[in-house]
Amino acid sequence: MPHSYDYDAIVIGSGPGGEGAAMGLVKQGARVAVIERYQNVGGGCTHWGTIPSKALRHAVSRIIEFNQNPLYSDHSRLLRSSFADILNHADNVINQQTRMRQGFYERNHCEILQGNARFVDEHTLALDCPDGSVETLTAEKFVIACGSRPYHPTDVDFTHPRIYDSDSILSMHHEPRHVLIYGAGVIGCEYASIFRGMDVKVDLINTRDRLLAFLDQEMSDSLSYHFWNSGVVIRHNEEYEKIEGCDDGVIMHLKSGKKLKADCLLYANGRTGNTDSLALQNIGLETDSRGQLKVNSMYQTAQPHVYAVGDVIGYPSLASAAYDQGRIAAQALVKGEATAHLIEDIPTGIYTIPEISSVGKTEQQLTAMKVPYEVGRAQFKHLARAQIVGMNVGTLKILFHRETKEILGIHCFGERAAEIIHIGQAIMEQKGGGNTIEYFVNTTFNYPTMAEAYRVAALNGLNRLF
């Protein structure tokens, strides 16, 4: 006789991965509950990560644009805004996102339960509710989509009022004049752009020898130059020895012997999976040192009825990919296998000022693979649309095979890069000979547009062939 469960599946977490899984499951007729420990749905992406940081970035970039445009500014009075004012803008966006996502669950009759979940046995969860009560829930299958949080080394006092991580920085109430950012990954670089755009002095401490080493080197170099040109001080190959919080700021002692002092510190070096409170040992699951779970191609863990998606499984740790992972896991959970799969070349968007976006291979990868490629470039300053809107800083680079003309990689630095990249991605994904750089020469673009950069870059690249 089959066992009776409260739900067909329980999804732990309502971020992009959890939402993708939950929507995929209810569309297939499953009885689903989503457990969210926070008071609102959306997960870290909506409340502490992607959405607020991008809303901050947008507000700051518009201030920069206003102050640099002689049409609006006589340069005797610069437009300024406090960090608190800009955070209010982010809060408005977060509230809109929360209401919208809450509506998704309600329309699809997907139950939302608030509290902290922990496994009791292979098919049972205990839910610690906000009122102190404990509920017991059973399900045939589970999707763990509990996300990640900033990594906290034990020797750094994050209770100090001037030491922040990428979550707590969003509740900063003072106006710093000088910020130390430890960790020059995506989050560190994005916040370096935001603070420098607000005319705050920034020291960016990088534990490696260059910024964002996974990028094409020209894109990484462009960001380094832009930071340097705007006044960000980058310190490569440095690690902290000791971090001291004091009344008027923070002092960082580096292993190289240097000492740095600033009004506050943003520690942005690594993230940890939110798995420590799930009691995974009760179902025989183990995480790695970063609290992450290993999964197979269908996002199953070592327990076949337990799936995991999003930040909790590590790479690529993108909201866009997490949603698709959830959707694929939902298909595998119901049907036993998934026909859908993540695309091979996942686009990357980095919301510095200016933006960086890429898809496909870098020049360094193609050179190492001994692929005969050529490069086509378009400088934004040569595009009519960029001249009209004052977006002269930027470039689009297309890497393509010299013989087959197949597009192998696209890299963009400049405002709207994360949007521009998708035009090229759409052609790269074409099968049966559809992926060719000649498409951009043979098609007609609206004029004037930023998309025209593809035609300019394609002509530039094809003219190099002989």
Swiss-Prot record:
State its cofactor.
Answer: FAD
Q: Which Gene Ontology cellular component annotation is one that this UniProt entry carries?
A: cytosol
Give the reactions, separated by semicolons, that this protein catalyses: NAD(+) + NADPH = NADH + NADP(+)
What GO MF terms are annotated? dihydrolipoyl dehydrogenase (NADH) activity; flavin adenine dinucleotide binding; identical protein binding; NAD(P)+ transhydrogenase (Si-specific) activity
Give its localization.
Cytoplasm
InterPro entries xref list: Class-I_Pyr_Nuc-Dis_Oxidored, FAD/NAD-bd_sf, FAD/NAD-binding_dom, FAD/NAD-linked_Rdtase_dimer_sf, Pyr_nuc-diS_OxRdtase, Pyr_nucl-diS_OxRdtase_dimer, STH_gammaproteobact
Q: Which residues bind FAD?
A: E36, R37, Y38, Q39, N40, V41, G42, G43, G44, C45
How many and how are cofactors bound here?
Binds 1 FAD per subunit.
At the top of the EC hierarchy, this enzyme's class is oxidoreductase
Record-level GO BP terms: 2-oxoglutarate metabolic process; cell redox homeostasis; NADP metabolic process; pyruvate metabolic process
Keywords recorded for this protein, A-Z: Cytoplasm, FAD, Flavoprotein, NAD, NADP, Oxidoreductase
Major site of localization recorded for this protein: cytoplasm
Similarity section: Belongs to the class-I pyridine nucleotide-disulfide oxidoreductase family.
Q: How does it assemble?
A: Homooligomer; probable homooctamer.
Report the function annotation for this chain: Conversion of NADPH, generated by peripheral catabolic pathways, to NADH, which can enter the respiratory chain for energy generation.
Q: What is the protein's name according to its record?
A: Soluble pyridine nucleotide transhydrogenase
Native organism = Escherichia coli (strain K12)
Taxonomy-wise, where does this protein's organism fall, top ranks first? Answer: Bacteria, Pseudomonadati, Pseudomonadota, Gammaproteobacteria, Enterobacterales
Q: Which gene encodes it?
A: sthA
